[in-house]
Amino acid sequence: METVEAGHDDVIGWFEHVSENACKVQSETLRRILELNSGVEYLRKWLGTVDVEKMDDYTLETLFTSLVPIVSHADLDPYIQRIADGETSPLLTQEPITVLSLSSGTTEGRQKYVPFTRHSAQTTLQIFRLSAAYRSRFYPIREGGRILEFIYAGKEFKTLGGLTVGTATTHYYASEEFKTKQETTKSFTCSPQEVISGGDFGQCTYCHLLLGLHYSSQVEFVASAFSYTIVQAFSFFEEIWREICADIKEGNLSSRITLPKMRKAVLALIRPNPSLASHIEEICLELETNLGWFGLISKLWPNAKFISSIMTGSMLPYLNKLRHYAGGLPLVSADYGSTESWIGVNVDPHLPPEDVSFAVIPTFSYFEFIPLYRRQNQSDICIDGDFVEDKPVPLSQVKLGQEYELVLTTFTGLYRYRLGDVVEVTSFHKGTPKLSFIYRRKLILTINIDKNTEKDLQRVVDKASQLLSRSTRAEVVDFTSHADVIARPGHYVIYWEIRGEADDKALEECCREMDTAFVDYGYVVSRRMNSIGPLELRVVERGTFGKVAERCVGKCGGLNQFKTPRCTTNSVMLDILNDSTIKRFRSSAYD
């Protein structure tokens, strides 16, 4: 097979051009959005009957940002609900909306509808082409190669008005653009559509692994939407590898696969291969017996060049385990986007995930940035949590090192929409900013004057998990937290799922370590004054976070949409966690 290069220079050349002229391109993007959707009910409410085509770019931007308010999903929800109920008049877009996406509801505990149009699928195809082009500069792959992709299409349902609802990834995997992406990038997923859309995580994952090994010599890289999914898949593989070897040897399929369409599709692809089964068995015995599964991916897929997934933000906790499985294989952080819009591409795929930032693609949406400043005194106004907000600025006015909340105006009918993501401008690619994702704005632990971010929590758990691994043979599999404000005094609760055995003394030390590792001044003072109670560590039984994921997937979300929230107030999730708690510890720090 030949190395893929054709077409990469063209798409990179396009992006270099729009990046160089990002300011002008952003003005053109806003104009295109407003011209395409001129006259829709929502824009008429704020802009009246203004003739967009007769205005110059500067006047149009000024008018738009002065008259159209910044909104949250709650402000647009009545319009989206009318669309869902079957109203066909142009409310948000001139293009009829027949499909709605479920935006991730794992952070606030509820699902949100977002319009999905052909533009959504087209930008997904474009960013995948662009990402593949930049990756090929460092990790060229062979034409016609395979991808071991752990991808899952969730369930779809119909609204009262007959619109199809599902996750954005579910819509994409069913689209022509998904097929085009494989043909354009010359890389083909190992699994057929019947596996991707199977709807049962365990059965789908088993088949992904089986077919990945069936095509093992052809696999060029391993991928999934989130690093969590890859880690979960290979953790599952540790338990079922013998079963997979038996299937490869006999050309059969385990009885655990009960979905008829999936069974038929997989059985049509595999044939008995005793020599491959023996080879895999030999490697797995060595991995299991002597290596603790270190290097699993690189040993079983020797031609794989890298592993690709979202690895930033709430995916950072899974990097250590992913690196363990990778065994030196490069980890490439996938691009930055949301259900609402793709935002930025990773133009530096050779960098470790911890150092990655994303170059904003100025044609995908019109971007604004709300400057965020840490609160200095109590007299500040316009305070939201731990920040003072300044007036939003366009992409052309962002500053290096400044933190912002992203605001989107999209082709799909979201106007000056607060995304909730806090980002930092780390550098520039030509004329477009490169953004580092900091955290979701509302994911902050707080009882009173204390303010701890997702990054703070991650650092605290990292310190305690290192202590756990030094003193025991156990490791933290997953975690989340909750600010218990009902108890008096309120306190932080951190839930751990661990693998291996850890005695109570070690876990008590871990609990104490986490309590003292929060260095936010408001927290330390409050703990000393006992206005915040001792931190509580709750250890949950094995498989608990899997139950949480299944519950979310069961509510019509796809696993590709699911991310373990690092802080939760969701009552359903808390019920699962609390019902599964097997040990509790309270910190003795500050006694």
Swiss-Prot record:
GO CC terms in record: chloroplast
Enzyme class: ligase
Tissue expression per record: Expressed in cotyledons and hypocotyls.
GO annotation terms (biological process): response to light stimulus
A Pfam family it matches: GH3
EC number(s) reported in the record: 6.3.2.-
GO molecular function, one term: ligase activity
UniProt xrefs under InterPro entries: GH3, GH3_C, GH3_M
Keywords, alphabetical: Ligase
Entry superkingdom: Eukaryota
Function recorded in the entry: Catalyzes the synthesis of indole-3-acetic acid (IAA)-amino acid conjugates, providing a mechanism for the plant to cope with the presence of excess auxin. Involved in red light-specific hypocotyl elongation. May act downstream of a red light signal transduction and determine the degree of hypocotyl elongation.
Family: Belongs to the IAA-amido conjugating enzyme family.
Designated name of the protein: Indole-3-acetic acid-amido synthetase GH3.10
Protein source organism: Arabidopsis thaliana
